[in-house]
Amino acid sequence: AGLVGSYHIIYNPTLLDKCNRAAELSGYNNLNVLSVHALIGAYSAEGGQWADELRQVIAGNVDFAVDYIRNHFNGVSLFRPEGTYMLFIDCANWLAAHGMTLDELLKMGWDVGVVWQDGRPFHGPAHIRMNLALPRSRVEEAFRRLDTYVFNA
């Protein structure tokens, strides 16, 4: 699932050939009808307005999540993300205080319906990644569940 609609401008013929071969091998080089219309929409005035509104929603979600974590989850820390909708949450102190592993914490979140991601593949030994590109009501519900059933259970 997903839209294929990116493009590139490469002036170096050798690099262009390598890029085209890689695109062909990946299978992600062919546009479909939905991708074409999405790309056209993205460059329209309405697409710009939509992107502006999306940035506002994501910024609000980031503000909410960062403030919530700092005020409610003792032993959990993070930096405010810049230019992304993903949180990178450091749980090392919380895990040590509760004698738990990251795998146990990840499972606790999943068990209460919070979909989050192991941060170890991103060089965070006790980190969790969390996507905030969703409606505010869902972000609030996720943090309510984490507060009630995971971090302050």
Question: Model-derived features: where do they sit?
Answer:
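PLP-dependent class I/II
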Residues: A1-A153
